[in-house]
């Protein structure tokens, strides 16, 4: 993915199909709503690509995608960032994940993560650990490197790589992460509507 921008030969003049054409189709018929109680969530950070002096990413920087997936329902969340740190790991929970489950009347019980510096440390110094502790959420970090616990986040990220980001990069050639996030929110909302109708 490091050479994604070069490999795709993205040009601002290239015709851009509507993002709506790539959004998951939401079935209209009555179906059973998937269990969506936030009992067990999985969170993972992915490196997306490296950019240089583009848009609102100054200098030579990286783009990361923070993802969270509900184990039982498949409901997912994603945000793009220009850095990897504990504050961004907290931000996606505070701005996307917790408000969603609060609207559902659900309480998050536990979150599984890798045992990396973004997620693990000693409270009160570590923002992510402190946030989970004050929110009464149990943190379950991976016990050993390479443990394949995060397949849910991996599958969701691969779906974004295939269905969202190629189109989004063409649309946001100057790489405004703010504008890209707006489109990502719309895409993820449609994705979640499909998950809840399964």
Please tell me what each predicted stretch does.
Residues 1, 44, 68, 74, ...:
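Mobile genetic element proteins and their domesticated derivatives, centered on retroelements
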Residues 1-39, 45-49, 125-129, 147:
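Basic, flexible linker segments flanking DNA-binding modules
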Residues 55-82:
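Short conserved beta-strand segments at catalytic cores or DNA/RNA-binding microdomains
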Residues 61-62, 79-104:
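Active-site beta-loop-alpha junctions of metal-dependent nucleic acid enzymes
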Residues 75-79, 140-142, 166-168:
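Short small-residue beta-strand/loop micro-motif enriched in glycine and branched aliphatics
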Residues 101, 166-175:
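Short, polar/flexible loop-turn hinges at active-site or ligand-entry regions and domain interfaces
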Residues 113-115, 119-132, 138-165, 176-182:
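RNase H-like two-metal-ion nuclease catalytic core shared by retroviral integrases
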Residues 171, 178-198:
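Charged, gly/pro-enriched flexible loop segments at helix/strand junctions
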């Amino acid at each position: 993915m490091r050479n994604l921008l070069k490999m795709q030969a993205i040009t601002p003049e290239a015709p851009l199909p509507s993002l709506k054409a790539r959004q998951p189709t939401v079935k209209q018929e009555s179906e059973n709503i998937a269990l969506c109680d936030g009992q067990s969530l999985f969170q993972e950070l992915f490196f997306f690509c490296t950019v240089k002096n583009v848009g609102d990413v100054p200098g030579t920087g990286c783009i990361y995608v923070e993802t969270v997936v509900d184990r039982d329902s498949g409901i997912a969340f994603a945000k793009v960032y220009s850095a990897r740190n504990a504050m961004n790991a907290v931000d996606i929970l505070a701005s996307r994940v917790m408000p969603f489950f609060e609207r559902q009347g659900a309480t998050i019980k536990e979150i599984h993560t890798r045992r990396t510096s973004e997620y693990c440390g000693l409270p009160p110094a570590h923002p992510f650990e402190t946030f989970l502790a004050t929110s009464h959420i149990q943190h379950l970090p991976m016990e050993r490197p390479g443990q394949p616990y995060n397949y849910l986040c991996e599958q969701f990220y691969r779906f974004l790589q295939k269905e969202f980001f190629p189109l989004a990069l063409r649309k946001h050639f100057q790489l405004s992460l703010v504008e890209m996030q707006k489109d990502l929110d719309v895409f993820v909302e449609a994705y979640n509507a499909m998950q809840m109708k399964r």
